[in-house]
Amino acid sequence: MFQQNKHHQQQQQQQQQQGVVQSGVASATVNNPSESIVAGNIYECSLHGILSTPSSTFIQRAKGMMRCEHPVSYKEMVFKSTVQSAGPSWAEGSILPSEIHVRYEKNTVYVRYVGVPQIKDNINAMIRNVVDIKSSETFFIYLENLGYVKDYEYFVDGYQYSTYNLSLFLVNHRRVLNDGTKGELLNKHSMVELQCLSGEEGFVAAAEYLNTYAEYLYPFVELIKFDHRLLTAENSNTPTTNVNVVGGYNR
């Protein structure tokens, strides 16, 4: 009986610890794009870096830290809204996002909404509201009817390493050629992102969780809190180059 109670207490403690970092996970399958979607406020907390050391050394460290590894390969398309108002007449009162990401992965369509990054001075991580939904090819017609057009696209290839609620991505970005195939690399070095999901009450714990793992990856890669406001300030004083610094792709 004592062993059972002890085991039960350990399970409760583990669930509580995980709940601090990830207070909820939202997922939904959309067969009809016009169906209403119900999802909680899920936030993606992340740190970013560029791998300048040999990838073999980094991968060895990542495998030692994480529980599982699997390849990542998909095509990301970003659609931009051309509607200046809140939306079409039949969607009066709704607020349409300025951008919607559509991901092709293993012949499956995933729709991803990514909110504007939140920069909180007392939290050492980037925070974004995210919604991921599995959809179908008909979603492209739905996007067109809503007034969205494709802005840019790129390929992503690499690996994802996971443990508990944490994911580590080591990826490269490639251009999309006119025939839809993969082109040359957009960056000399691989991009690294460490991320976990969190509810609104768990930002501080999630950031501490990320930075603890980031210390284990240093000096192989330095993962930092990316502040997009610095790019905006720099771009206001310099000519536009049409290059997205984070993703490394041309529009």
Swiss-Prot record:
One of its GO terms (biological process) is positive regulation of transcription initiation by RNA polymerase II. The keyword Iron does not apply. GO terms for molecular function: transcription coregulator activity. Gene3D superfamilies: Hypothetical Protein Pfu-838710-001. Keywords: Activator, Nucleus, Transcription, Transcription regulation. Belongs to the Mediator complex subunit 18 family. Component of the Mediator complex, a coactivator involved in the regulated transcription of nearly all RNA polymerase II-dependent genes. Mediator functions as a bridge to convey information from gene-specific regulatory proteins to the basal RNA polymerase II transcription machinery. Mediator is recruited to promoters by direct interactions with regulatory proteins and serves as a scaffold for the assembly of a functional preinitiation complex with RNA polymerase II and the general transcription factors. The keyword Transcription applies. It comes from the Eukaryota. The lineage of its organism: Eukaryota, Amoebozoa, Evosea, Eumycetozoa, Dictyostelia. This is Putative mediator of RNA polymerase II transcription subunit 18. InterPro entries: Mediator_Med18. Its main location: nucleus. Coiled coil: none annotated. Component of the Mediator complex. GO terms for cellular component: core mediator complex; mediator complex. It comes from Dictyostelium discoideum. It is found in: Nucleus.
